[in-house]
Amino acid sequence: QTGAQLYTVRSYTQTIEDFICTIQKIADIGYKAVQLSAVSKQIKPEQIREICDRADISIVLTHSDPERILHDTDALIKEHDILGCSYIGLGCMPDKYRTKEWLSHFISDFKEPAKKIAAAGKLFMYHNHNLEFETFAAENLPNAAPNRRILEYLLEGFAPDEMGVTLDTYWVAAAGADVCDWISQMSDRIPCVHLKDMKVKNWQPVMAPVMEGNLNFSAIFHALEASNCKYLLVE
């Protein structure tokens, strides 16, 4: 199913009036699903669910505050029950964990909430950027080696029922990695995928709408058909 990532229209989700209008416009385009990201905290889960239900829109994924995932897990799960949402997402690894000294702490810190989320019948989802393709010999983790990627440590540190990956096509490509290869490697871990293209402007890679850049989406879609992907979220 194709859905919309609301982060793209975050400027128009900061009041309940704007949120109602934005969801209706998304429904009018033909989308049947959304990911909640950067929506105003003043809009309550009950209100969000009611507005989306009226527009026949399902809420399939969120990006949630890492502190809430860590320290307010039970309440966060209940909010996702209200939203009718099974995937509780982390938008980005907090800065402090992104080193060889601290990566093991990310796995140990998020393991407990990930297990709680799984026990509630939901799944903790990790959204990649390009930073997860940095390589180093992580401290206090098994199979550490200088050429191992952060993403590989995460996949080893969390079981498939503890962590899924919201694979982002742009950011995989921005890391110089093969998007189709990583779809294949994580085929049982990617129920949600972010679709965005990449083009070049002034010698720099920049984000672009799908099919307006240089990524091979014909091959990407073919690879996704062989995976467990359920939701293609356009960003």
Predicted feature locations:
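Acidic-and-aromatic substrate-binding clefts and catalytic sites of carbohydrate-active enzymes
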Residues: 10-16, 35-46, 64-73, 95-104, ...
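N-terminal pre-domain/capping segments
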Residues: 1-87
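A cross-domain feature marking catalytic cores of carbohydrate-active enzymes
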Residues: 4-8, 36-38, 61-66, 90-92, ...
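Structural preference for beta-strand elements that scaffold enzyme active sites
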Residues: 1-3, 33-35, 56-61, 86-89, ...
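Alpha-helix-loop-beta-strand connector modules within alpha/beta enzyme cores
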Residues: 48-64, 110-117, 152-160, 217
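Conserved, mostly hydrophobic/aromatic
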Residues: 4, 26, 34, 52, ...
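Acidic/histidine-rich catalytic cores of soluble enzymes
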Residues: 119-217, 221
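Glycine/small-residue-rich loop that forms an oxyanion/phosphate-binding "nest" at active or ligand-binding sites
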Residues: 71-105, 109
